[in-house]
Amino acid sequence: MLAPALTHVVKGIVDHPDDVRVVAKSSPRGEVLEVRVNPEDLGRVIGRSGRTAKALRTLVTALADGRRVRVDVVDD
């Protein structure tokens, strides 16, 4: 449920929504959501001083309802 919600939000931010990929992985410390976007959109997703990325992490934490979830913006 978290990956589709995060995908929807990120697609609304970027200029190339077809390139947005969110992959959910399990780790011993909880779930990890890896966000991959077009390299041209990386700055939009991270935001000035990381503000947008922090807002995305806050949103996912609220939706996680107490579960441990980490959001990583991956730079390929």
Swiss-Prot record:
Highest taxon above the source species = Bacteria
Compartment list: Cytoplasm
Q: What InterPro entries does the record point to?
A: KH_dom-like_a/b (IPR015946), KH_sf_prok-type (IPR009019), KhpA (IPR020627)
Residues in KH domain copies: 30-76
Any one Gene Ontology MF annotation carried by this entry is: RNA binding
What Gene Ontology cellular-component terms does the record carry? Answer: cytoplasm
Principal localization reads cytoplasm
Q: SUPFAM superfamilies this protein is in?
A: Prokaryotic type KH domain (KH-domain type II)
Keywords assigned by UniProt, alphabetized: Cytoplasm, RNA-binding
Family as reported in the entry's similarity comment: Belongs to the KhpA RNA-binding protein family.
**HAMAP family linked to this entry:** KhpA
Q: Which NCBIfam families match?
A: PRK02821.1
What does this chain do? A probable RNA-binding protein.
Q: What is this protein called?
A: RNA-binding protein KhpA
List the top taxonomic levels of the source. Bacteria, Bacillati, Actinomycetota, Actinomycetes, Micrococcales
